[in-house]
């Protein structure tokens, strides 16, 4: 007689999500279709699962630049039939590392002060200045600033790798704006020809 064997179907997990991210990028979501009665076990290298472990949708924070992987084992609870996906490879692109150079102490109303970072071909530059005005170089790696009359100012730079969208914003580069002296000349404004000993002061 025939010995009947039931051949249960296998699940078909498919991972969806970004396969290129920025180093240390958080909040990246990976999913597979949710099927009732199935369980989901995720494995990760080069990052950490920060939400959704044990479900069909996880949230990941990736680590430093390099390669990362995800793998998913989906199991049909009723039959214990399971499939583990191939590795889902993720490239973690490096972030730029802008460093601002320029005078940290200036005089009120100074003009022509230059602030810069190393120029990297293919990167873009967005500057923000507090307490002064950018007069040249906006959108480049080197700007010229005219300072105002306040006691302090700040320079901040966001550098972006155009090809990947990976960006880094610097902390504020603090600038001390020293006040100008206020000389006032006192003395006669009308004198006699050849008059000697006339005193002027401030």
Model regions: which residues?
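Short, exposed coil/turn segments at beta-strand boundaries within extracellular/luminal domains
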Residues: 22, 77-85, 107, 163-170, ...
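Solvent-exposed loop segments of extracellular immunoglobulin-like
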Residues: 35-41, 120-126
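Low-complexity "stalk/linker" and mucin-like segments enriched in Ser/Thr/Pro/Ala/Gly
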Residues: 41-55, 108, 129-140
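Proline-enriched interdomain boundary motifs that mark the N-terminal boundary
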Residues: 9-18, 94-103, 179-187
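Interdomain boundary/hinge segments at the C-termini of tandem beta-sandwich modules
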Residues: 3-9, 88-94, 173-179
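Solvent-exposed segments in extracellular or luminal domains encompassing
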Residues: 56-67, 141-152
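Hydrophobic/tyrosine-rich beta-strand signature of extracellular beta-sandwich/beta-rich modules
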Residues: 72-74, 157-159
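A short beta-strand segment in extracellular, disulfide-stabilized domains
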Residues: 25-34, 110-119, 195-202
């Amino acid at each position: 007689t025939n010995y009947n064997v039931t051949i249960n179907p296998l699940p078909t997990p498919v991972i969806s999500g970004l396969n290129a991210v920025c180093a240390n990028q958080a909040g990246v979501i990976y999913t597979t279709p949710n099927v009732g009665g199935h369980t989901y076990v995720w494995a990760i290298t080069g990052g950490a699962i920060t939400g959704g472990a044990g479900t069909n949708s996880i949230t990941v924070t990736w680590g430093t630049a390099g390669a990362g992987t995800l793998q998913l084992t989906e199991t049909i609870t009723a039959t214990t039939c399971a499939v583990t996906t191939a590795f889902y490879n993720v490239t973690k692109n490096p972030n730029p590392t802008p460093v601002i150079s320029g005078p940290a102490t200036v005089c009120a109303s100074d003009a022509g002060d230059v602030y810069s970072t190393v120029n990297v071909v293919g990167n873009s530059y967005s500057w923000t200045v507090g307490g002064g005005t950018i007069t040249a170089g906006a959108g480049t790696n080197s700007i010229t600033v005219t300072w105002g009359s306040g006691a302090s100012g700040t320079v901040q730079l966001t550098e972006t790798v155009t090809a990947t969208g990976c960006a880094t914003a610097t902390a504020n580069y603090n600038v001390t704006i020293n006040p100008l002296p206020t000389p006032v000349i006192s003395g006669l404004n009308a004198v006699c020809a050849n008059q000697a000993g006339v005193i002027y002061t401030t």
